[in-house]
Design a protein with these regions (language model features):
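Terminal, non-globular segments
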Residues: 1-163
Length: 163
């Protein structure tokens, strides 16, 4: 049973990485905004498997994103995805205690924290107005959260958003 579950996670991981590669980007103030499907997958990993696997998978996702998209910031996404993997892994501990609204608030705050840390690292030493930074962080967080809600309601009847 454990081997079967492990193989399923590996296959889903490969599928999610392929989907992430082909997600279209849009431009906002000369900055590319790309939906982060990987953080949504980490949310489900944290909800169903816990911290350890979510941290490991977060690091793998992060270093993969670093190598593919931003070699100049090598390690930035690995750091943030690992840290957020720790936070999202907490979901399994409070699965039966927190209400759906509490879980949703926690997940949104984790997404917000993830993008705040990443863009703090990315914009360090670059003159980007704080208002643009806040807008980009907000857009990324809301976009990821909305995709999570749509996926959860459409494909997972007993997922993260259900009581």
């Amino acid at each position: 049973m454990i081997i079967r579950s492990f193989i399923q996670v590996i296959l889903l991981t490969v599928a999610v990485l392929i989907v992430q590669l082909y997600i279209p980007a849009f431009s906002f103030n000369d900055l590319d905004i790309i939906a982060d499907i990987l953080i949504i997958f980490l949310t489900y990993m944290g909800f169903y498997y816990g911290r350890f696997y979510t941290i490991i998978l977060g690091f793998i996702f992060g270093i993969t994103q670093d190598l593919i998209t931003q070699i100049d910031l090598l390690g930035a996404m690995a750091l943030t995805k690992s840290a957020i993997g720790f936070g999202l892994g907490t979901l399994i501990l409070y699965r039966n205690i927190w209400s759906a609204k509490s879980r949703m608030l926690f997940i949104f705050l984790m997404y917000l924290l993830h993008f705040m840390i990443f863009y703090f690292i990315k914009f360090n030493g670059v003159s980007v107005p704080i208002s643009i930074s806040i807008q980009v962080i907000s857009i990324h967080s809301f976009l990821s959260f909305i995709i999570l809600l749509v996926m959860d309601k459409s494909f997972f009847p007993h997922g993260v958003t259900s009581d």
